[in-house]
Amino acid sequence: AKVIRSGKVSPADPQAQEIHGSPPARVDGIVTTGDVVRVGPLRLTAFATPGHTEGSTSWYWKSCEGTDCRTITYVDSITALPLGTYRFADHPDRVAMFRKTIAEVAALECGILLTPHPAASAMFERMSGARPLEEPGSCKALADSAARRLDAALGKGADK
């Protein structure tokens, strides 16, 4: 909420050297893991997924068409993206935060998985019908990919 209120990127953000902030915005409330936000008939449950940013928040909810109900899970970006001179190897607390988030996402039964970067979860292929909309193990696959990217980011930092 601090970044949204101020519009200033946290210097601890791995992308801080490349992101130049945004206009400040009013924050009406803060959600934490387990909080439920109602949007019309939907009840969205928040869960923290820090890593890509410290305040990353993901959501899950049940959506029904008649008696056909599905769980939908939006997982915010869990990609380790160091920009500029940022080295994950120099920030063990951030690495631990990422690893905890990745493990939590891997354990989820996502139902229909949504991500902010469609390629991370084959969203376009699933929405077009080229792949099943709901794929068992989709959260584990997303987490495994994120773990590989984090390991690669750590490897890049180790040789400098």
Predicted regions and their residues:
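Residue-level preference for alpha-helix termini and adjacent loops
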Residues: 2-3, 30, 36, 77, ...
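Residue-level signal for well-ordered alpha-helical positions
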Residues: 6-9, 62, 126
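Accessory terminal helices/loops
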Residues: 66-68, 80-160
